[in-house]
Amino acid sequence: MTSKEYAMLAAKTLDEKKALDISIIDIAERSGFADFFVLATVSSLRQMISLTDMVDEKLAEQGLIIKNIEGKGESGWILMDYGDLIINLFTEEARNKYQIEKIWGDCETIDFKEE
């Protein structure tokens, strides 16, 4: 699978499990550390932890192994590093605070529901 296909799989898994405001950002042209970000908002710490496990399991089934995970949810943000793919799960408050979409605003976003 390509990095984009992994990003799509992660986004679809998050969508199936009721994450909110899911987006995929293609950062390959501006980044030397990854090709795609997947961003999603969660409604609770419990959901954040559950989604972390579910997405990791789904990607591992396809051969993509996590390299690192940052945060434990208490900060309102968990970052899952798969190398070319970075998945960010936020509480609504943390997502508004860090404004990742604004930082990478000139990058292409991908609609995972249409692909």
Language-model-detected regions and their locations in the chain:
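Ribosome large-subunit tunnel/peptidyl-transferase-proximal elements
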Residues: M1-D53, E57-K67, E108-E115
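C-terminal structural segments of small proteins and small subunits
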Residues: L79-I110
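Mid-chain, well-packed structural core segment of small domains
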Residues: K58-F90
